[in-house]
Regions:
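A beta-strand signature from Gram-negative outer-membrane beta-barrel systems
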Residues: 1, 71-113, 177-179, 192, ...
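Extracytoplasmic beta-strand/coil segments of soluble accessory domains associated
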Residues: 1-46, 76, 86-103
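Short, glycine-/polar-rich solvent-exposed loops and beta-turns at beta-strand/coil boundaries
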Residues: 4-12, 89-94, 209-212, 246-248, ...
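Surface-exposed loop/interface segments of Gram-negative outer-membrane beta-barrel transport/assembly proteins
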Residues: 28-29, 34, 45-46, 107-164, ...
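Short acidic/polar hinge/loop motifs at secondary-structure boundaries
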Residues: 37-81
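Residues on the lipid-exposed face of transmembrane beta-strands in outer-membrane beta-barrel proteins
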Residues: 102, 114, 182-186, 216-222, ...
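Transmembrane beta-strand segments that form the barrel wall of outer-membrane beta-barrel proteins
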Residues: 116, 197-203, 443-452
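Conserved C-terminal beta-signal and adjacent last beta-strands/turns
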Residues: 618, 725-753, 836-883, 911-926
């Protein structure tokens, strides 16, 4: 399993993949089940709450439904990976299942617990950008080589300048967090209870961002009769997110990096400032954007279930359960008028959106369990049905009377009102049988028959099987004398699951409004495809469990192969079908089943307990290898699926026979170091046909030299190729816990190896990327500046009678720092040096000290005098340090939502970086 934190914003989610990427376009996140109830909306994007524009198209942040849950209520998490385990969840378990169990009461006197925590978070890493002195030197060089004609008198002597404005330091803050929980548990032999209430307030490390949560939980179990048990699980949460446009080329992070250091944050009166300067364009003050623009998301969520266990006769139990998940959210955005130099916003604007989601789930199943001698048998048969409904209403308006008024109904502009609704439903029958002989031989069979409203009437139902067997060979007589070998088990499993995560009514054609010269009208929003059907998944799993020395040393090995067929995705159609255009005219392509994906891998877990007694050491090491391959694409003539960036840049492709999401671009071989080098190399698009070179309009010395992949002597789009995979070769985690008497120390390391990251911020932006060096008014990464191709005259004494300069004479220009792979600075960039290439692909491998916790539990004799059952204090550091070669903030980059296709992975477009958090906590039980 790989878990990638998509954003460092408080309340954000992780992108989790269980045994690889099993689908290309349908939801690839695992199923979360809390106390038997399915969690709705795993990692929803901001657009789901009406925040798509406010959070930007380049956003990789997602709003986590798990952020509404108090982690202190959780007692265990179990990950179901192989098909024999997930098959009972049918269509919902194709991407794996994460089972979360919360705390329950136990018989005995009431116990009260207080858990408190205070934390401080910081961004300890900085991207190496130019300070004012370095920027002045760079500006002067552009003047010296003719890229800029007007020198700036303020930069005449860079040595007397200071460092200027450090915009990174300005947007980051030391963020405070505190969390408090009070819980009570206890009960009698008949009734047990657990109740809790918690509050958390967490500042983000980007100024203005914040997350606040209040939650309560009640878990109740009552044995009313010998044959009847009732239970209730319920939790309510209320959260408020103060979000910021952090990600993407228009986000605060990128704006802070590309803002030049000679602009102050505030003027002499303490007001936000910007700059009025030719060439700067609509330059945003990132501090003003963070503090002036409001993006608020308020959520309320009620989740739980009511269940009963009835035992009418011996060995037979009937379980019935009604689950529910009801949520309401309100998003509010407000952008005030702005008059800050080149940054102008003529009108204020606001948008409100209300979302309501209602989910109910009904389960009934009978379980029969019996034992005859050494034979143990269980048989279960049941049904499940659920329905999920959603609706929203939104209103947008401009020209509000003042910045204190955010109600869109009071705006003087023309209001825009939107609404929508939809639903999905599923009905299922399932059965599972298990057989165990003498704790040696095990067999399990599972079958599930699902019907989903996400498909048309002809393809609504599908059935899926799984079977698994295991042999505990250490129970055999011939193993009795090997006392040091405590456990040995072979496992083999095969199973089918399915995927229906394409949304309700995706098989039909929806209606969308559109404006025309004749007034309002309606059009089809998408092309229908009633033939779309289930995406199926078949998985083999072979496992080996070994235990030695009374299980003080345990080894678990799993080999698996998982094949997904009939992939759910949008059909690739030519533009003449009407599938391209703006939002008011584009006709969405139909959903269909196209192709297959294969994941195969190896998982190894080593669990050891080397020391026991006063000093104890528990160690757990896990490593996972996964190979992902796009096996086939059917129903389309396309050989690959292309993911697009913010400006329709091709960033990645998924080609048959290769892993998904490979980056797609040019291979940089170096730079042209002389005219002779240009003439002896394949011709570029800007190679002069008449032989006359021009520094501003044709290829030039110092421009990038790209590899001629197809060897046709020309550099063009046919020379783009696979330039790296964002998927790791392996991931790993190592957890160590040391205990000495009352002290405990936990150290958790994790990492990833072999994955590449596209540092998109270096390549592209409104006025150029952070390493493109094609603008004098965009700050640049120091690594690029230091390694740039430095042009120098071959003959510095050559005289030009027409008054020309050496840098305009290609016969007299060479690169001084031979061997560099970074181009010359050029404002026109005729060679397109900032096109996607290996120059922007970096090694994303890392080793991270993820968690370090030191705790102390007070001795029992001390606690008894204070009338406490338990007192524990601890300090913790999260994300202490990351060992990596990646030049950005954080190499942990997952799926990107910068395009609705969802085909991009490992693209760092200025994401909200993950902070280092220092915390101190106390737990009291009495």
């Amino acid at each position: 399993m790989t878990a990638v934190q998509t954003s460092g914003a408080p309340g954000s989610s992780s992108s989790i993949r269980v045994r690889g990427q099993a689908t290309i376009n349908a939801n690839a996140e695992p199923l979360y089940v809390i106390d038997g109830v399915i969690v709705q909306g795993n990692g929803a994007s901001g657009s789901s709450f009406g925040l798509g524009d406010a959070l930007g198209n380049g956003s990789v942040s997602t709003i986590s439904p798990l952020s509404t849950i108090n982690p202190a209520d959780i007692v265990s998490m179990e990950i179901l990976k192989d098909a024999s385990a997930t098959a009972i969840y049918g269509a919902q378990g194709a991407n794996g299942v994460i089972l979360i169990t919360t705390k329950r009461g136990k018989a005995g006197e009431a116990k009260f617990t207080y858990d408190g925590m205070f934390a401080v978070s910081q961004q300890n890493r900085r991207v190496d950008m130019m300070n004012l002195r370095e920027y002045a030197e760079f500006y002067n060089e552009l003047v010296s080589v003719g890229e800029i004609y007007d020198a700036n008198a303020y930069y005449a002597d860079p040595s007397i300048l200071g460092v200027g404005t450090n915009w990174q330091d300005a947007i980051f803050q030391t963020a405070l967090q505190h969390q408090h929980q009070i819980s009570a548990s206890g009960g009698t032999d008949k009734v047990q209870y657990y109740v809790s209430g918690s509050y958390m307030d967490q500042e983000g490390t980007i100024i203005g961002s914040n997350f606040e949560r209040f939650s309560v939980r009640t878990n109740l179990d009552a044995q009313l009769k010998k044959w009847l048990k009732l239970g209730v699980n319920a939790t309510y949460s209320n959260t408020v997110d103060d979000l910021k446009l952090a990600d993407g080329e228009a986000g605060i992070v990128f704006s802070s990096l590309n803002s030049i250091p000679d602009i102050p944050i505030y003027d002499v009166d303490g007001n936000f400032t910007s700059e009025t300067r030719e060439g700067l364009g609509s330059r945003v003050n990132p501090i003003a954007m963070a503090m002036l623009d409001d993006i608020i998301l308020k959520r309320q969520k009620l989740t739980g279930n009511i269940f009963a266990d009835v035992t009418p006769i011996k060995n037979l139990t009937w379980h019935t359960e009604l689950g529910f998940d009801v949520s309401h959210s309100k998003s509010e955005t407000y952008e005030p008028m702005v008059d800050l130099g080149n940054w102008q916003r003529g009108n204020n604007e606001t948008r409100w959106q209300n979302n309501t989601n209602t989910f109910w789930q009904l389960k009934n199943y009978l379980t029969y369990a019996n034992q005859w001698g050494k034979h143990n048998v269980t048989a279960m048969v049941g049904q499940e049905m659920w329905e999920s409904r959603w609706e929203y209403q939104s209103i947008y308006n401009t020209k509000l009377p003042s910045d204190e008024v955010h109600n869109p109904s009071l705006g003087a502009g023309t209001p825009t009102i939107g609404s929508g609704f939809g639903s999905s439903a599923m009905a299922s029958l399932f059965t599972r049988e298990t057989y165990n002989y003498d704790d040696r031989y095990y067999l399990t069979y599972t079958y599930r028959y699902d019907g989903s409203s996400n498909f048309g009437p002809e393809n609504r139902w599908a059935g899926f099987h799984s079977v698994a067997g295991s042999w505990r060979f250490t129970q055999e007589k011939w193993m009795e004398n090997l006392e040091w070998w405590s456990n040995g088990k072979l496992r083999l499993g095969w199973g089918q699951t399915c995927n229906s995560n394409i949304g309700g009514y995706a098989w039909g054609s929806s209606i969308s409004p559109m404006d025309s010269a004749l007034g309002a009208g309606y059009r089809p929003a998408n092309i229908a495809n009633t033939a779309v059907q289930w995406e199926s998944q078949t998985q083999w799993n072979f496992g080996l469990d070994l235990g030695f020395f009374q299980d003080r040393l345990n080894l678990t090995v799993d080999l698996y192969k998982k094949v997904s067929e009939d992939m759910l995705m949008s059909m690739q159609l030519p533009s003449y079908m009407g599938t391209q255009g703006n939002g008011s005219s584009a006709l969405a392509a139909p959903k269909g089943n196209f192709g297959s994906i294969e994941n195969k891998g190896l998982e190894i877990t080593l669990d050891a307990h080397p020391f026991v007694g006063d000093f104890q050491w528990d160690s757990n090491f896990q490593i996972s290898f996964n190979r992902n391959t796009l096996v086939a694409l059917s129903g389309t003539t396309a050989a690959s699926i292309v993911g697009y960036g913010q400006w329709s840049d091709v960033v990645c492709v998924s080609e048959i026979g290769k892993p998904l999401y490979n980056f797609y671009g040019y291979v940089v071989e170096g730079v042209y170091e002389s005219l002779e080098d240009i003439e002896n190399s394949p011709k570029t698009a800007k190679h002069p046909t008449n032989g006359v070179y021009n520094r501003a309009n044709t290829v030039w010395v110092g421009d990038l030299k790209y590899k001629d992949i197809n060897e046709d002597g020309v550099i063009n789009e046919q020379d783009r190729t696979d330039i790296g995979s964002p998927l790791p070769k392996f991931t790993f985690g190592w957890n160590n816990t040391f205990r000495y008497k009352n002290f405990d120390l936990n150290i958790f390391l994790n990492g990833s190896y072999g994955n590449k990251v596209l540092n998109y911020s270096l390549m592209n932006g409104p006025s150029g990327g952070l390493a493109s060096m094609r603008s004098a008014w965009v700050n640049q990464n120091n690594d690029a500046i230091k390694d740039r191709a430095q042009l120098t005259p071959i003959d510095p004494y050559k005289v030009y009678e027409d008054g020309s300069m050496w840098y305009n004479d290609i016969t007299n220009v060479k690169v001084a720092n031979s061997g560099t792979k970074t181009p010359r600075p050029t404002l026109n960039d005729p060679n397109d040096n900032d096109r996607l290439s290996t120059r922007y692909i970096e090694d994303g491998s890392y080793l991270r000290i993820k968690n370090l916790t030191l705790g102390y539990t007070f001795p029992k004799k001390w606690m008894q005098k204070a009338h406490f059952d338990n007192i524990r204090v601890y300090c913790n550091i999260q994300n202490l340090y990351t060992f990596t070669k990646y030049s950005g903030y954080d190499p942990e980059v997952g799926a990107s939502t910068q395009d609705s296709s969802g085909y991009a992975y490992g693209v760092d477009n200025g994401r909200y970086p993950s902070p280092t958090t220092y915390s101190f906590g106390v737990s009291l039980t009495f």
